Amino acid sequence: MEFKMQKIILGMLVVTASNAMALNNNFNVYGKVGVDLVSRFDTIAITRHDTQAPKNTARFSPSLFAEITYNATPKTEVGLGLGYIHRKSSHHIIKQKTDNGNRALIDVIEEYPVNRYNSIPLYFLVKHNFYSQSDLRSYLKVDFGYAFNKTKSTLNLTESTDAAGNNQYYIEKHNISLNVENGNYYGIGFGVEYKNILAEIAYTHTDSRLTYSSKLIRGESEYKNDALRFSVGYRF
């Protein structure tokens, strides 16, 4: 899925760049690569005990985007964008005392990967340019659209419990099914363009909801993402 989508986005960049010369001066084609400097998800603990949720640790999250715009006015562009955002997962392990349901505390160790989701946002955009010099300009850009989200369909959770308090742990493994929903995608960014090269910083938000289930563990929760993204690109 990830490799296939990267090929699609790269192919789109090649096609749009090769056809950019055929467009009249009222159209612009942009290609961008970026990385999320900060990426925060809603906190979720996949557990049947009252254990702490995984830390919201920032991970390296690269992205690819292609955009085409029309010059609606001398300073305003409107258009469409398509992107791919890859978000890396992390590993969670927690050891703590928890209530066994009979008002007694037992030691529990839980270990599982924290599966993040990748997104394919498709969005409308409005861009306002502030001209300062002939080759240099700054701009403000707003995106709003829909994100198609995908994560790994299963998660393996290892649960170790010491009910007797003698460091003899009973180990259970749970195969948990996961599903994330698609949702709204929006962002606002500020950028600088020199000749055909641009740099941009943007805040983005992706809506999603996570559902997880196994024989003993079941639940659902909001799983939104907020990110601060830095991108560089080229106007063809």
From Swiss-Prot:
InterPro entries documented for this protein: OMP/PagP_b-brl
Superkingdom assignment: Bacteria
Record keywords, A-Z: Signal
Secretion signal span: 1-22
UniProt-recorded name of the protein: Uncharacterized protein PM1543
Annotated organism of origin: Pasteurella multocida (strain Pm70)
